[in-house]
């Protein structure tokens, strides 16, 4: 079994890379792919860069060049659930674009033309993530809707508008739905694992800078525990 792991920023993949053994590196189109062993599994870890286009490029290259059996997207996110604190984790129950609108042609808000309204993660990956939750200690984790768009959300007015469109949204970030859409296109199972770096409010820019390392570590820990559950 080979697992592809994608994070957007260095703090989101640094702990994973540091824990790998037998690591080898290859750079394609300016994106570094590091293959090796992590938690007893063959993995390929890459830092995609921020945003949906960067994530799509990295995911496509990862799938085409390394043919993983599954893809895990790890990293940070803004939180939309009052019961979660910075550092807590959201496991994707579904993933949607929050900045897509082709409703004029009969699609749902957030649904790209000729694509499903929501991208559903692989049940066995979600199950493995839920089994890993028990080992997280004080870190809380829930399943929930993760939404993606090419914006850092820190405006309360925009937050409320997003919640009107996606009332069950647990977290938002900038890569997950793009990665999920590419995986859907290629028929590769995926899951998104995100640790909260901020609460998508006026304090978010300061919180993000302060807590991105913490969020990256918690998300990486969750990924490693998930890998241990996979057979």
Curated annotation (Swiss-Prot):
The keyword NAD does not apply. GO terms for molecular function: adenosylhomocysteine nucleosidase activity; methylthioadenosine nucleosidase activity. Keywords: Amino-acid biosynthesis, Hydrolase, Methionine biosynthesis. It holds the Pfam family PNP_UDP_1. CDD domains: MTAN. One of its GO terms (biological process) is nucleoside catabolic process. Substrate binds at residues 78, 153, 174-175. Catalyzes the irreversible cleavage of the glycosidic bond in both 5'-methylthioadenosine (MTA) and S-adenosylhomocysteine (SAH/AdoHcy) to adenine and the corresponding thioribose, 5'-methylthioribose and S-ribosylhomocysteine, respectively. Also cleaves 5'-deoxyadenosine, a toxic by-product of radical S-adenosylmethionine (SAM) enzymes, into 5-deoxyribose and adenine. Belongs to the PNP/UDP phosphorylase family. MtnN subfamily. This is 5'-methylthioadenosine/S-adenosylhomocysteine nucleosidase. It comes from Shewanella sp. (strain W3-18-1). The lineage of its organism: Bacteria, Pseudomonadati, Pseudomonadota, Gammaproteobacteria, Alteromonadales.
């Amino acid at each position: 079994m080979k697992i592809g792991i994608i994070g957007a920023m260095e703090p989101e993949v640094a702990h994973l890379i540091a824990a790998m053994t037998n690591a080898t590196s290859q750079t394609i189109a300016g994106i570094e792919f590091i293959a090796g062993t992590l938690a007893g599994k063959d993995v390929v870890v890459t830092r995609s860069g921020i945003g949906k286009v960067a994530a799509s490029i990295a995911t496509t290259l990862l799938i085409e060049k390394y043919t993983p059996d599954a893809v895990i997207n790890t990293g940070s996110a803004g939180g939309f659930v009052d019961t979660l604190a910075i550092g807590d984790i959201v496991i994707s129950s579904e993933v949607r674009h929050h900045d897509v609108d082709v409703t004029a042609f009969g699609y749902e808000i957030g649904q790209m033309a000729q694509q499903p309204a929501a991208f559903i993660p692989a049940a066995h990956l979600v199950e493995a993530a839920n089994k890993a939750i028990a080992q997280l200690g004080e870190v809380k984790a829930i399943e929930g809707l993760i939404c993606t768009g090419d914006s850092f959300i820190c405006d309360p007015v925009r937050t409320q508008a997003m919640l009107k469109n996606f009332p069950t949204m647990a977290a938002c970030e900038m890569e997950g739905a793009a990665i999920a859409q590419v995986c859907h296109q290629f028929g590769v199972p995926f899951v998104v694992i995100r640790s909260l770096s901020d609460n998508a409010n006026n304090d978010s820019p300061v919180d993000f800078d302060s807590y991105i390392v913490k969020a990256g570590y918690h998300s990486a820990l969750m990924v490693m525990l998930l890998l241990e559950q996979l057979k």
